[in-house]
């Protein structure tokens, strides 16, 4: 990423006399400081060469302009200090240490009278963090094409120039050339001339001008004139084959193109006392068109692409594409059969459809360029931006070994080849092979820039000594691990976790068990804020130290935080909305996530090793949305069918059956004694322990203790425990309880198991389903009250026949089940009232 707080440079089209120079990859515009609060916006696209220079160049107080990287060096091998004008230069990118200059004159302490920069080394005395956003640039000796717009499919440059991609690549990598502006339009039909195939290209020119005699000079030693032929045995030999004196010329055995490459040749041999120079001889076989072409400029490489893009008029080209589209539509309408609905010529229709697709692609590219106010020649780079050094650092390990970013090596290759190209260009015209070597060096520079931007996308892949491909700029910003998706669009932070799920039978439907270690990482920012707010930690570092040491106060703060927040549980694959739901976290000491078994159907999860991810909604808006839309009690029905999703099954149904089972019923009738004596009981801490069988005497003591605890009204007609119960052998062997709470307490204390029979006082307003059989016994007192005794209940009524006291015979498991149902219903209605 690049940052800017300078105005955008003027467009290249505004001044055609200036050197056309590149654009960049990603550019960031920052509003000026004097305009008020700092605001930044991000725009991805092309930038002009002037814009890149504005990003990188700075004017020092002494008037010197810095920002251009000239040397391919990074740091000195002995002092480990950045080299001047190199890739880590402190003059360009800022000091490594805040307030320290490179020469050592200033060492962090500055007076009010001190200058803002060092007079000796030119380093600005500012903070070192500027090395994260200050850029540099490389002035390329020859323009190079941006590989993103050349190699991607579809190729933007190929569509704009309406040339095959193969021809464009040949021109970019100096495999062919084009004629200069003076005659480009004249030879447009010839296309690009491939280097190494001049004979074929010139043959096309000569053929068009009907100069058939060229065949007498190329590809053979035999020269045919009229109907006679001779063989040239030497480099220069006189031809006297019945020709007139005015037509006799001196012919060399050299190839025609090698002779044509020399502009002036001296006379070689005397023929009938006439001096005939080679140049005159060649003109007999070459037309004036070749002479015109020979005098024009030959363009190749990125500069040729740039010149062609400059000549593009996007508006006119868009109009031309629209006309072509209308023409194709007319052709399509003429080919259509109204009856059969088929084309007359299927091959021609396929060509039309292919041409339509090309027009659509080209139109989209041109409209995007016009809308973004981007000039097409910016796709050719002549100024290459250099990323800030802290984004491509050199790190020293403990052993003293230095490791560097791959970008530094790729930048060095670009600088080395750019320097070599500038040397060969300075020798061009003075050395024989300077033109050829400069052309090869242009292609080498193009490949180096391709590797920097997208290694492997160009013609070759750059590798290190271990045959490992260098990581280019594209590799650093694309994909899941790239700068955009990982650091800008979404940052990878500790707001999510993953673990195995296990069943949590003691959890409520809206709860999930969250491991304490995982919760400590998930809610760490909230814990830090709470510690600082409550003045339990003075600063951020102290709060992190407390969390790292896991001090006891941390768990108390964490417990308070999780009470008011929901977490999201997600199980892949998330095929529908029930695949991710919100739960209230409950801290547990295990390392697995506890999940209520009723919500497993929505997740399509089971407890055979499945894993689930935990996410924390950060903002209050996200918390509210999770509580309203994603909370597990709000997702009991399937959004597809409307049927219930949270339905008990498997072990839940079996548990309900066992919980409401009477010990003397069914197959358990013969096992009641042994099962009750060694049954599993719930304790106060939700642990399970084995209870031992109590003797009859302890049972009687327990009944008496319950009688004393209940405090019955003695000698009252409304006594809670009638005297006849003690005299009836069918009743006194089972304990009597006043309400649910007494039963639950006895279960937790281990006095009852789930299958223990008991008498429970029943509210009069709830009906009792008595046995179909009649009462076992009737009892009356002096006041007229009656007691009806059944095999599973007894009811006490007044003289008017209204019942005012009821007791039912049930089990502890049924009491526990009924109490849980009533509690859930009450909690639901209380939440609705809120």
Curated annotation (Swiss-Prot):
It holds the Pfam family RNA_pol_Rpb1_1. It is found in: Plastid, Chloroplast. The gene is rpoC1. GO terms for biological process: DNA-templated transcription. This is DNA-directed RNA polymerase subunit beta'. Zn(2+) binds at residues 101, 103, 118, 121. Residues 26-36 have a biased composition (Basic and acidic residues). Coiled coil: none annotated. It catalyses: RNA(n) + a ribonucleoside 5'-triphosphate = RNA(n+1) + diphosphate. DNA-dependent RNA polymerase catalyzes the transcription of DNA into RNA using the four ribonucleoside triphosphates as substrates. SMART domains: RPOLA_N (SM00663). Its EC number is 2.7.7.6. It comes from the Eukaryota. InterPro entries: DNA-dir_RpoC_beta_prime (IPR045867), RNA_pol_asu (IPR000722), RNA_pol_N (IPR006592), RNA_pol_Rpb1_1 (IPR007080), RNA_pol_Rpb1_3_sf (IPR042102), RNA_pol_Rpb1_clamp_domain (IPR044893), RNApol_RpoC1 (IPR034678). The lineage of its organism: Eukaryota, Viridiplantae, Streptophyta, Zygnematophyceae, Zygnematophycidae. Binds 1 Mg(2+) ion per subunit. Binds 1 Zn(2+) ion per subunit. In plastids the minimal PEP RNA polymerase catalytic core is composed of four subunits: alpha, beta, beta', and beta''. When a (nuclear-encoded) sigma factor is associated with the core the holoenzyme is formed, which can initiate transcription. HAMAP family: RNApol_bact_RpoC1 (MF_01323). Mg(2+) binds at residues 606, 608, 610. Keywords: Chloroplast, DNA-directed RNA polymerase, Magnesium, Metal-binding, Nucleotidyltransferase, Plastid, Transcription, Transferase, Zinc. It comes from Staurastrum punctulatum. Belongs to the RNA polymerase beta' chain family. RpoC1 subfamily. GO terms for molecular function: DNA binding; DNA-directed RNA polymerase activity; magnesium ion binding; zinc ion binding. It is an enzyme of class 2 (transferase).
């Amino acid at each position: 990423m690049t940052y800017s707080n300078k105005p955008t440079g003027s467009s290249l089209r505004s001044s055609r006399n200036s050197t056309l120079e590149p654009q960049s990859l990603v550019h960031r515009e920052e509003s000026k400081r004097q305009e008020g609060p700092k605001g930044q916006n991000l725009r991805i696209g092309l930038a002009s060469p002037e814009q890149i220079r504005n990003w990188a160049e700075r004017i020092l107080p002494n008037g010197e302009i810095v920002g251009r990287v000239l040397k391919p060096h990074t740091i000195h091998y002995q002092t480990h200090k950045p080299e001047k004008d190199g890739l880590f230069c402190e003059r360009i990118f800022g000091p490594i240490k805040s307030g320290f200059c490179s020469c050592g004159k200033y060492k962090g302490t500055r007076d009010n009278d001190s200058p803002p920069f060092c007079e000796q080394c030119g380093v600005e005395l500012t903070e070192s963090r500027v090395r994260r956003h200050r850029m540099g640039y490389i002035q390329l000796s020859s323009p190079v094409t941006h590989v993103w717009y050349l190699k991607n499919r579809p190729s933007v440059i190929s569509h704009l120039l309406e040339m095959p991609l193969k021809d464009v690549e040949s021109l970019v990598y100096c495999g062919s050339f084009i004629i200069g502006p003076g005659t480009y339009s004249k030879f447009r039909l010839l296309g690009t001339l491939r280097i190494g195939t001049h004979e074929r290209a010139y043959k096309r020119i000569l053929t068009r001008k009907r100069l058939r005699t060229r065949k007498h000079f190329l590809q053979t030693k035999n020269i045919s004139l009229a109907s006679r032929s001779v063989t040239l045995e030497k480099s220069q030999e006189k031809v006297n084959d019945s020709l007139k004196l005015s037509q006799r010329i001196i012919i060399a055995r050299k190839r025609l193109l090698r002779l044509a490459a020399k502009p002036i040749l001296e006379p070689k041999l005397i023929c009938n006392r006439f001096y005939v120079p080679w140049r005159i001889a060649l003109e007999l076989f070459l037309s004036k068109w070749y002479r015109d072409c020979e005098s024009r400029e030959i363009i190749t490489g990125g500069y040729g692409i740039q010149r062609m893009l400059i000549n593009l008029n996007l508006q006119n080209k868009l109009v031309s594409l629209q006309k072509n589209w209308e023409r194709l539509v007319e052709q399509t309408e003429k080919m259509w059969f109204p009856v059969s609905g088929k084309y007359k010529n299927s091959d021609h229709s396929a060509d039309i459809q292919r041409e339509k697709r090309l027009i659509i692609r080209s139109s989209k590219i041109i409209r995007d360029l016009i809308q973004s106010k981007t000039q097409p020649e910016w796709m050719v780079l002549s100024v290459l931006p250099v990323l800030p050094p802290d984004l491509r650092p050199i790190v020293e390990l403990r052993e003293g070994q230095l490791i560097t970013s791959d970008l530094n090596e790729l930048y060095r290759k670009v600088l080395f080849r750019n320097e070599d190209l500038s040397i060969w260009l300075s020798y061009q015209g003075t050395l024989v092979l300077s033109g050829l070597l400069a052309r090869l060096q242009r292609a080498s520079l193009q490949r180096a820039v391709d590797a920097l931007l997208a290694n492997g996308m160009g013609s070759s892949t750059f590798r290190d000594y271990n045959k490992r491909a260098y990581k280019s700029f594209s590799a650093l910003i694309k994909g899941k691990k790239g700068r955009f998706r990982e650091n800008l669009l979404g940052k990878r932070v500790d707001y999510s976790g993953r673990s195995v799920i296990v069943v949590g039978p003691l959890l409520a439907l809206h709860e999930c068990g969250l491991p304490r270690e995982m919760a400590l990482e998930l809610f760490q920012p909230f814990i830090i804020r709470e510690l600082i707010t409550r003045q339990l930690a003075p600063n951020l570092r102290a709060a992190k130290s407390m969390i790292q040491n896991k001090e006891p106060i941390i768990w108390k703060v964490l417990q308070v935080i999780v009470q008011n927040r929901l977490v999201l549980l997600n199980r892949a694959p998330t095929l529908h909305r029930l695949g991710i739901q919100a739960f209230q976290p409950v801290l547990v000491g295990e390392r697995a996530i506890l999940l209520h078994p009723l919500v497993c159907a929505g997740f399509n999860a089971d407890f055979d090793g499945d894993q689930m991810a935990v996410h924390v909604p950060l903002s209050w808006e996200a918390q509210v949305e999770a509580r309203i839309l994603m909370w597990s009690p709000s997702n009991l029905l399937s959004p597809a069918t409307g049927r219930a999703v949270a339905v008990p099954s498997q072990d839940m149904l079996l548990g309900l059956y066992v919980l409401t089972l009477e010990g003397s019923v069914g197959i358990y009738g013969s096992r009641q004694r042994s099962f009750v004596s060694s049954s599993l009981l719930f304790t106060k801490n939700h642990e399970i322990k084995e209870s031992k069988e109590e003797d009859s005497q302890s049972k009687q003591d327990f009944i008496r203790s319950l009688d004393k605890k209940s405090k019955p009204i003695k000698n009252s007609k409304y006594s809670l425990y009638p005297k006849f119960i003690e005299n009836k052998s069918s009743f006194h062997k089972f304990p009597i309880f006043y309400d649910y709470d007494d039963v639950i307490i006895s279960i937790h204390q281990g006095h009852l198991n789930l299958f223990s029979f008991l008498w429970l006082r029943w509210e009069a307003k709830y009906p009792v389903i008595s046995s179909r059989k009649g009462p076992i016994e009737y009892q009356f007192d002096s006041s007229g009250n009656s007691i009806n005794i059944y095999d599973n209940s007894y009811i006490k009524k007044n003289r008017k026949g209204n019942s005012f006291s009821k007791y039912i015979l049930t089990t502890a498991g049924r009491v526990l089940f009924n109490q849980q149902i009533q509690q859930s219903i009450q909690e639901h209605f209380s939440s609705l009232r809120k």
